[in-house]
Amino acid sequence: MAQFLLSCESTVDVPFAYMHSRGIPVIFYSYIIDEQPYPDDMGRDPEALPRFYAFLDAGKLPSTSQINQFAYYDYFKELLEQGGDVLHIAFGSGMTQSVNQAYEAAEQLRAEFPGQRLEVIDSLCSSSGYGLLVDGAADLRDADKSMDETIDWVMAWRKRVHHQFYSTDLQYFRRGGRVSGPAATIGSILGICPIMRLDDRGRIIAYDKARGKKAAVRTTVDMMAVHAVGGTDYSGKCWI
């Protein structure tokens, strides 16, 4: 039996069914379109993802918001009421400051549940890299490692998860203010794809560019081989 309950957030970007199968509860972010909030439920509702992509096809740009302290409080309280200790691995602070809301909620609940532990860790990770870190923590939990052993592993490995990605559409970066309008237009016409990674604080860094998707894929794969332990002989997990 696991010594503690492991928890995460929907930005692990894997199907809800997978996290459920691993016994990992999830708190959902939301996205907002036309002032209407929709849960990022990781496909738990089979209509959710088709609806989201239909919005994008219609030219609607979603916005997101942080999970607030009250939502974290209710979520953590429900987990603590199951009677065990809780380790929550949060979405990286380089992408959102929601983790600060989680810290505040956890501090409040520690006073209400003095006989239990509630620990919150900033993953410094995003998307499937975040999911990979949580999955590794679940492996330790299932191997009957203690919460402290798992925390030590997460703290050591959160800066070793390598995120590598690219984009074929600069217009989303223009809307987010990361590139200027003219640069986005010219880049899109020329087929320029920025090559990106996360730095050790979990922030997006555009460090290179490629002309066309094939070149972007090739550069991405090459850089993954450079950073993987053992290079092309790496045989561990890799989440895409």
Language model features: what each stretch is:
Residues 3, 11-19, 24-36, 87, ...:
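Mixed-charge interfacial surface used for oligomerization/domain docking
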Residues 5-71:
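N-terminal glycine-rich anion-binding loop in soluble enzyme alpha/beta folds
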Residues 45-52, 75, 79, 123, ...:
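N-proximal short alpha-helices
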Residues 69-99:
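N-terminal glycine-rich phosphate/adenylate-binding segment common to multiple enzyme folds
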